[in-house]
Every structure is written in C-alpha cells, then in structure tokens.
C-alpha cells in the first residue's frame, strides 16, 4: 500500500477544510420518527455550549471553519451566529428547519433555503454564500434542487 505524506511536499502548501453543522441533537434526521418538529421548542438545547466548545478549540489552534447553520437555530441564538462571524469563520446555510431536500417539493425547498439565507444574513450582517443539504439529501432524483439553490443565492436582503 502506498503511503501519502502527511506533510506538504517541497514547494507545496497544505490546505485543509473544516466544516461544522450547527443543529441541535434533536434535529438530526435519525430522530425524525421520534421527535416531531412541534416538540423542538420544548427540548433542552445543547447547541450553544457545543458550538462554544468548538469555537474555543478552533481559537486555540488558530483554525477557521465554515459553520453550516440552521435558520431555526440562528433565530434562537443570534449572539452565537454573530460570534461565529466575529471570530473569523464563514457562516453558511444548512436550511431553516433541517428538512431533507428529497422529502420536499421544489417550492417548499426553495422557501426553506431562502428563509434560512435571509435570517442568517439579517442576524450576522454578512452575505451567506454556502449551503449544505441536511443529510446529504440531494441526488439525481431531485437535481431540481440545484436550480433552487442558485435562485436563492441570487436573492439579496
């Protein structure tokens, strides 16, 4: 088996990417059958202390990351979203309500990602350019989602 060097080769720079999904434990797709969206408000949130720990680690190592953040979380923790940006990280969208793209109509999907983009930009006062679909839910069967993402990207505050 050929080994890949763990340090840059002479004349080459090492480049890594770090991304974080900002969602609460009860919002993950695996829990959808057990935790209704109508129950989210009543759940004890862990997102704020968890993101604060991640921010502290990134600061300790001088690293930057992209935080794919739910609009739902941003509305409830605007100070956390502002801190992510203030500490030099990229803010990106993970949709508003962590709904799989594959389980939505094109219109519902566009509404979800559009709302998320507007909420994030209004709170953080930065342009949101990135998007990650919940549970990697875009594929050949719903390739229409790419057009929706492009349309949402063109929307300005």
Where are these regions (language model features)?
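Catalytic alpha-helical scaffold of carbohydrate-active enzymes acting on polysaccharides/glycoconjugates
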Residues: 2-130, 135-157
